[in-house]
């Protein structure tokens, strides 16, 4: 094998080694089940505005009266920031509706590809929801 071919082989291997984990990270189907949509109405209890995704904990009153906290995965903070969203736009205690898909893991309270709709109708889109993380910024 020539030196040029060897360098090309090594470069290709490095690129593949670096991009495979990134692709796996963004494979929604690895963690979430698109055949299990879920709609939640509840109160924001916690917001984690950190990379690589924001997470919003939403407390929901189940039909039997028990309170359950769901962890809703959102888009990347920088994506939302570029659209005009800020950490302060969602508030602890705010009533929201969440539309997303359930996690595959039994017993998991994680929700992916979620759209969070505030009481005044603003929408914040999660990774892959609504055609990506695009959505109107707060008014």
What do these predicted regions represent?
Residues 42-44, 95:
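Conserved hydrophobic positions within beta-strands
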Residues 23-38:
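Short boundary/loop segments of OB/S1/cold-shock single-stranded nucleic-acid-binding domains
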Residues 1-11:
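Bacterial N-terminal signal peptides that target proteins for export
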Residues 82-98:
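Short nucleic-acid-contacting surface segments enriched for D/E, G, S/T with interspersed K/R
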Residues 129-139:
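Disordered, low-complexity segments in secreted/periplasmic proteins that are enriched in proline
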Residues 9-19:
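Bacterial N-terminal signal peptides
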Residues 50-60:
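Short aromatic-glycine-enriched beta-strand elements
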Residues 103-128:
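OB-fold/S1-family single-stranded nucleic acid-binding modules
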């Amino acid at each position: 094998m020539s030196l040029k071919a060897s360098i090309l082989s090594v470069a290709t291997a490095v690129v593949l080694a670096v991009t495979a984990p990134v692709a796996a990270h963004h494979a929604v189907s690895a963690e979430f089940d698109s055949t299990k949509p879920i709609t939640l109405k509840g109160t924001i209890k916690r917001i984690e505005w950190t990379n690589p995704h924001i997470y919003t904990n939403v407390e929901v009153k189940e039909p039997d009266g028990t309170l359950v906290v769901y962890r809703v995965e959102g888009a990347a903070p920088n994506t939302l920031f570029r659209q005009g969203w800020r950490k302060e736009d969602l508030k602890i205690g705010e009533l929201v509706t969440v539309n997303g898909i359930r996690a595959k893991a039994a017993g998991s309270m994680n929700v992916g590809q979620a759209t969070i709709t505030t009481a005044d109708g603003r929408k914040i889109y999660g990774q892959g929801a609504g055609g990506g993380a695009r959505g109107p910024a707060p008014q």
